[in-house]
């Protein structure tokens, strides 16, 4: 017998009270079940969203979600990958007894995205082009790393200097001109360099709920660095139970790949009650040396490798020149979350992200030679680690200065190092960088009217950079201090923004925003190893950025979008203060006179669905980057060449070029074929030029 009957005397009065109570509970805890219309199986990860009320929910493994908060919503959008989008009112769902069957879709122009404003929005009402990669696509495509995951979009080019690499490029921009966001938290640090970076491999593709790539600037929401685009990663979330019984779900997989003898093991588990949810996800991966394809370039073949024998470096012939050794490495990823939802208004969660690789060799450096012998006996990236503690608080209300609020507090710790030793030289150089990144984001969404929404917020980010150098004699095992790669530095960013979305008419949407961002940098240099003409450098600057865009959507089969946006990137510690060998015979030195670079970007795109079978998408863009920071020849105390790492090297520095121009075209199509097959293709063309000091133009590097 239900315990509630034991608490109430059985009488007409108490029965009336009981009916009111059950009616109240049904009113305030209404569960929607979403199923596949063909096999009636429950659908998980279905997004339920109200465009007018900024209310959202996601179905659990049983295809269920509590939609009590949607009672006042006039339109409820329900979307799942591979299914037709449906719009209903709460009353319509009630008539269906809160059971909804979704039909497999053909093609759609509309989807729910987060990256444009950090809130769930309809992509058909956003003037920027956004590409989404779902967890189902990841499970089907099986990318080994998060860099490979981004390539699934067809819009991101990924450069790799070694197997343990992956440096994305979007619309001609790369490295620190792109912004990485994990669960709404900025991942970029003050030492994200202008050269190729591999920080994205710290993320686990198997723990992603969704990944979005926003093409073009979005500095209004994200601040500095968001010039070429934004990569927004949303990790797995705990699920809640809709009954008194705990909801327990999970999954596991193993994978083996022949090209690099990869062995991966992954497991995740979710345990949820009505108000509490827990999640744990772990992936262990080991990669052996990568085997090059039989039709690969001759320059990348490895006819020999270096081994240590009786205190000497020796050259050992490779039995298989296509084996790119050394290039193997291992990696561990783990994610743990605690989620507490006391009621429909408040939502609190804590997440611990952790990733660490083993040491891995930089393959292109091992291909270099000097006087007929290998240039290096060792050139490794040391273990790359990333840890993030993330606390988020969300609140929803129907009245007041906001409809929904999100507070994100995060502490990230990054460590990376470079270990190198010349061939048959006893001294091994080790340069280690540690960055502690503190951040606080407070974001709001407010429904001003049925046709207007306002998004606004503030951000504060502090990076504490600690850089150390050490030289070790591998014969005597004696270590001495060595030159560091960076100065000791603190980098501060603070900003405030506002963005308005207004439905001008049924077919026309306007979106416009404005942001102010301040940047401060304080660096102290060690001049005991290099004769720098300064010991301290400071930057204190600020920039206004904005955007104005229109979306014309005459119907669900066609849309046009146009957007103008500005963006900026302030010099970070890597731009201003690093000392490193950029290429054979060249050394980059600090330049304390750097200024921010500023971008103006124009974007025009269209998408069309033909006969519900063919989707065509075309976008063109043009970006002008003023004061672009690029590497150029430089002088140090009047000297154009200085000795570095035992070699006389040309002095270079990051400098503000006159202007850089980037333009391009992106096109793609998606064709639905019989029997569930699908054909897709993407085309990307981009060109970048920068003005030299003498007025001539040259191709841009990393732009």
What does each model-found stretch correspond to?
Residues 35-39, 46-51, 79-83, 95-139, ...:
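Short, acidic, small-residue-rich periplasmic hinge/interaction motif at the N-terminus
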Residues 96-101, 146-149, 166-169, 181, ...:
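N-terminal periplasmic accessory domains that precede
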Residues 187-217, 334:
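Short acidic/polar hinge/loop motifs at secondary-structure boundaries
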Residues 258, 376-398, 485-491, 535-553, ...:
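Outer-membrane beta-barrel signature, preferentially recognizing the C-terminal barrel domain
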Residues 260-287, 296-359, 385-387, 448-449, ...:
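Transmembrane beta-barrel wall of Gram-negative outer-membrane proteins
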Residues 325-331, 341-402, 413-435, 482-488, ...:
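Flexible loop and strand-edge segments within Gram-negative outer membrane beta-barrel domains
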Residues 454-558, 570, 580-583, 694-695:
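Signature of Gram-negative outer-membrane beta-barrel scaffolds
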Residues 505-506, 510, 519, 621-624, ...:
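Gram-negative outer-membrane beta-barrel transporters
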